[in-house]
Structures are given as structure tokens and as C-alpha cells.
Regions:
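Alpha4 helix (beta4-alpha4-beta5 surface) of REC/receiver domains from two-component response regulators
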Residues: 63, 81-105
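Conserved phosphotransfer microenvironments
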Residues: 48-67, 85-88
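Conserved phosphotransfer cores of two-component systems
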Residues: 43-45, 67-75, 95
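CheY-like receiver
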Residues: 121-135
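Acidic, metal-coordinating helix/loop segments flanking the phosphotransfer/catalytic sites
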Residues: 31-49
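Two-component signal transduction core modules
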Residues: 50, 77, 100-101
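C-terminal output helix
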Residues: 87, 105-121, 125
Length: 135
């Protein structure tokens, strides 16, 4: 089971991604509205991946990633950013971030994140999405 923490003061901006991720049977999602709240959660709980919006109320996603390294450097992090790929690479260098997420990430982004996370964890397993709508 992968424990993912989504961080955004506006859940609608990550709702497509959250919906796609919730379709996987091995993903447990939780939410935080602000960076400090997410850092507290990450310091007291087992989290595999934190996904942040570009602005998370009290800091940027990149600032959060930098602070997360001091709390638990083993937690993977991904962030939404409107920076160009080159600017994002320069700004995030050394932070250990997963690939940049676009505004309003969705199903394709969820698949890429989970594939990357599974690769990191050495668990390249079944990538099927479980249909929870037709029970």
C-alpha cells in the first residue's frame, strides 16, 4: 500500500489527480491544506509520496520540498509548477523531486507518478486501474 499526501488549500486543483489515484487499489490518499500541516503529518506518519500544488497557502511547493528534506529525506515529493522545464529543473535541483506536474494534473500524470514511485520502491507491479464506478 502506498501512502500519498496531497497538499493544496484548494482541493479542486488536484481533484483530477486525486480521482485517478483513488482508482488504484494500492493507494491510500490523505490531504493537507497547508505546508506546515503537511510537514507535521510527514514527521509523524509513514508517507511514500507528497504531491503539492504550486502554492500551498504558506509556502510554494518547491519551498515545501526543501523543508521536507529536513523532516524526512526518504519521502518522495512531486509539485505542480508553471515554470518552464528548464526553470523547474534549475529551481528544484538537489531537492530530489519527481517530474514536474502541470496545472490540473490528471490520470496520465497519476500513472506516471505511480510508475516512478513503484520504480523507486522496486515494486514494478500490476499497473491496472480498479474500476470503482461499476460495482
Amino acid at each position: 500500500m502506498f501512502k500519498l499526501l496531497l497538499v493544496s488549500p484548494d482541493k479542486t486543483s488536484l481533484s483530477g489527480l486525486a480521482s485517478a489515484l483513488s482508482g488504484y487499489g494500492d493507494v491510500d490518499l490523505s490531504w493537507a491544506e497547508y505546508g506546515k500541516e503537511a510537514l507535521d503529518i510527514a514527521s509523524n506518519n509513514t508517507i511514500d509520496l507528497v504531491i503539492t500544488d504550486e502554492w500551498i497557502g504558506d509556502m510554494t511547493g518547491l519551498e515545501f520540498a526543501e523543508r521536507l528534506l529536513t523532516v524526512n529525506p526518504r519521502i518522495s515529493c512531486a509539485s505542480v509548477s508553471q515554470l518552464s522545464p528548464d526553470e523547474f529543473h534549475a529551481a528544484s535541483e538537489g531537492l530530489g523531486l519527481m517530474p514536474q506536474l502541470p496545472d490540473q494534473p490528471g490520470r496520465e500524470d497519476a500513472e506516471k507518478l505511480l510508475q516512478h514511485l513503484r520504480s523507486l520502491k522496486g515494486l514494478m507491479g500490476d499497473m491496472r486501474v480498479y474500476d470503482t464506478t461499476n460495482k
